[in-house]
Amino acid sequence: MKLITILFLCSRLLPSLTQESSQEIDCNDQDVFKAVDAALTKYNSENKSGNQFVLYRITEVARMDNPDTFYSLKYQIKEGDCPFQSNKTWQDCDYKDSAQAATGECTATVAKRGNMKFSVAIQTCLITPAEGPVVTAQYECLGCVHPISTKSPDLEPVLRYAIQYFNNNTSHSHLFDLKEVKRAQRQVVSGWNYEVNYSIAQTNCSKEEFSFLTPDCKSLSSGDTGECTDKAHVDVKLRISSFSQKCDLYPVKDFVQPPTRLCAGCPKPIPVDSPDLEEPLSHSIAKLNAEHDGAFYFKIDTVKKATVQVVAGLKYSIVFIARETTCSKGSNEELTKSCEINIHGQILHCDANVYVVPWEEKVYPTVNCQPLGQTSLMKRPPGFSPFRSVQVMKTEGSTTVSLPHSAMSPVQDEERDSGKEQGPTHGHGWDHGKQIKLHGLGLGHKHKHDQGHGHHGSHGLGHGHQKQHGLGHGHKHGHGHGKHKNKGKNNGKHYDWRTPYLASSYEDSTTSSAQTQEKTEETTLSSLAQPGVAITFPDFQDSDLIATVMPNTLPPHTESDDDWIPDIQTEPNSLAFKLISDFPETTSPKCPSRPWKPVNGVNPTVEMKESHDFDLVDALL
């Protein structure tokens, strides 16, 4: 008894020891916020340009203890108004305007060591760029401030004046030039008020040598940068009457540019529309047409990629698509630009290597092409495993396949099979010496005891000796009160199964069509319910899974095609009717957290959330 008790306790204790302690906690927890703070601070520190990102809200969090504490986090961020180079933290920044602010979602795993130390183990952020300000041609509010395009020509005199103003009023040793205009606004008054935000970059021109910017002054990638916001008033005579400027300069840290690695003789990618490819492509298509034994010329349709390599000359490696044209080789001496592509012609995928020796004026092209195949239609019969290997049997010119035999496809399949069309079909089956066992469709041997009155033999879809109700071709043994009658006068004769089997079925059957259908369905369900019954297809091959490039039209779907799938009767309160989930459903009512700050005056504790789920009220509207 003690041994049983110990085993019982061990069986209850071992599963709890093997499971990792993981639980969902409140997104507004203080430790969760510290973990997100560490993750967001690390992300902002890795960016060197633009503005910092500010926390919007925490959406998911889970804590794992094994043995250290790990937080699995998912949080949303928005672009703030503080540059990365500023000394502010993300908590001191405000959100940027919604139309101009980038957004993102981050997934991070943060470890907690000790009581206060948080370290980021892994983090991935997906950033969505801002849509930018909406620029319209007309505004309903005359005299209101409205955004304008950053590429507007009206900004050129204002920006030119602003750059000159900055260079004349700063003590920096070098001149600065405009880098990027970020946003601009304008207001129509007695003239125009402009407000422009832009970035500047240090150039290679020092103030000792240059008093103003010249075309020789170029921006330095490793120089200082800055961001300015200017306000200017332009009067009706297009003169700048007032101007104010506020700039933040960000000195670059000591940085040594690593030497670029030179690879002499390595292939370098070139644009597919480069003019340098005209000569190699012309030699490639000429080589293709000379070696191809087709009756029509080919021309290049699309260039996929191209590289050039410096060897003893130049080596071009080009991948392109060539298509057959309407110009025949018999009536045209060479390919011309007037030759149009034949949309129904052959398509080739080509790899070309062209060696160009400029000093010898020689070109050595090599072209290797393969015809492009079309997507094949896969067909799998009911109950056939998708993991079974398929061998595609190809013939010259096309792929020969046959569809699986079903209740609606024997006539079409037999007509497409030329080997079976010639000569009479002997026996009661689809092939000599083969026996088909398919219960439920009248194929194969089947015994059924019934309360019928006689011994019926009916002709139908079945072939071979079959004993059943319905459309079976053969004998059916029944135990009843009447005499045994043999109504199958044609039984024992050789039939071609392509003959109108429905007509013979109706002539030999003494029951109504409704009774026949009812008995057939009853037989189908009972036969499918028998255990250990094998379903075999004597003429089925793996190639039946592959359809031809130009498949024949299949007959329309009818209700008899659904006889492959039995109707399983289930009670509403049975276990088969109710689905039992493998794992308990988890809910997280404590997430997402409240927004960190209000967005455009929205209360952070109350947020309107759009729901795209289906509502029953929608069906009543």
UniProtKB/Swiss-Prot annotation:
Gene3D superfamilies: 3.10.450.10
Domain of life per record: Eukaryota
Main localization (coarse): secreted
Keyword Membrane assigned: no
Record: glycosylation sites: 47, 87, 136, 168-169, 197, 204, 398-400, 406, 512, 520, 524, 536, 548, 553, 570, 581
Keyword Secreted assigned: yes
InterPro entries for this protein: Cystatin_dom, Cystatin_sf, Kininogen, Kininogen-type_cystatin_dom, Kininogen_Fetuin_HRG, Prot_inh_cystat_CS
Disulfide pattern: C27-C591, C82-C93, C106-C125, C141-C144, C205-C217, C228-C247, C263-C266, C327-C339, C350-C369
Cystatin kininogen-type domain residues: 27-131, 150-253, 272-375
Entries under CDD domains matching the protein: CY (cd00042)
Phosphoserine modified-residue sites: S331
UniProt PTM comment: Bradykinin is released from kininogen by plasma kallikrein.
Site (Cleavage) residue list: M378, K379, P386, F387, R388, S389, R498, T499
Compositional bias annotation for Basic residues: 444-492
GO biological process: blood coagulation; inflammatory response; negative regulation of blood coagulation; negative regulation of cell adhesion; vasodilation
SMART domains, per the entry: CY
Subcellular location: Secreted, Extracellular space
Pfam families: Cystatin
Any GO MF annotation of the entry: cysteine-type endopeptidase inhibitor activity
Tissues in which the protein is found: Plasma.
Function description: Kininogens are inhibitors of thiol proteases. HMW-kininogen plays an important role in blood coagulation by helping to position optimally prekallikrein and factor XI next to factor XII; HMW-kininogen inhibits the thrombin- and plasmin-induced aggregation of thrombocytes. LMW-kininogen inhibits the aggregation of thrombocytes. LMW-kininogen is in contrast to HMW-kininogen not involved in blood clotting.
UniProt xrefs under PANTHER family: FETUIN, KININOGEN-1
Protein name, entry field: Kininogen-1
Organism of provenance: Bos taurus (Bovine)
